[in-house]
């Protein structure tokens, strides 16, 4: 599959890249998981809407927010069920024993139903299959032609400061007002602010009420800080 080959090539280029390029590669991988791939497992079709990159390379990318599980190494295109923390499912993209790399499926559509990180494993296990059954599957990434507008932000609920300011989340902007993304609102504030400032620059006579309506249209909610942003 050409798209899996594209992912593989990006992963292979990651290790020797400079930091800024590493972040860009992780963003590109996230973008491709959302727009170019769907996941097919035991009759469940998963469409990623919000994915977060977790990578650990001791020398080149020591992110201690990564679980550093053996299941995050050299299992390209396979699932990893979290062994600790909140619970969740990742897609491993590491193609080497030298480093961990996986993408948390933070928000998805599973057979058309919106699921958050902790809901997805419950739905998968309701099929009667075990975690091991899912983790043994190969070739689960299939071509998709989604046309989402992709944006980036920081990762949600990190427990360590490593790379906490890095925009290692890819998300489908057009999905935000359609589904319940309340878990992400803190991380989305900077995206809302940047969007609103650009909107006000393009519409210099807009009122606060118009700005609030635009925020609600695009992001599905209006942060408390909108009034401050508008009047400053």
Summary of predicted features, one role per range:
Residues 1-232:
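A cross-family signal for N-terminal binding/gating loops and helix N-caps
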């Amino acid at each position: 599959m050409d798209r899996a080959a594209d992912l593989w090539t990006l992963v292979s280029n990651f290790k020797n890249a400079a930091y800024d390029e590493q972040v860009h590669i992780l963003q590109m991988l996230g973008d491709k998981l959302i727009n170019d791939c769907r996941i097919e497992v035991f009759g469940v079709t998963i469409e990623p809407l919000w994915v977060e990159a977790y990578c650990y390379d001791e020398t080149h990318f020591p992110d201690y927010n990564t679980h550093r599980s053996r299941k995050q190494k050299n299992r390209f295109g396979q699932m990893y069920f979290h062994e600790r923390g909140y619970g969740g499912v990742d897609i491993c993209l590491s193609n080497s024993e030298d480093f961990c790399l996986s993408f948390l499926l933070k928000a998805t559509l599973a057979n058309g139903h919106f699921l958050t990180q902790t809901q997805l494993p419950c739905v998968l296990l309701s099929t009667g299959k075990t975690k091991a059954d899912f983790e043994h599957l190969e070739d689960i990434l299939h071509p998709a032609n989604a046309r989402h507008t992709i944006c980036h932000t920081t990762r949600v609920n990190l427990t360590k400061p490593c790379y906490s300011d890095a925009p290692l989340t890819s998300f489908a902007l057009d999905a935000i007002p359609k589904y319940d993304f309340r878990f992400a609102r803190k991380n989305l504030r900077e995206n809302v602010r940047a969007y609103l400032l650009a909107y006000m620059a393009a519409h210099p006579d807009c009122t606060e009420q118009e700005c609030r309506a635009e925020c609600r249209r695009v992001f599905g909610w209006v942060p408390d800080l909108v009034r401050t942003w508008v009047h400053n």
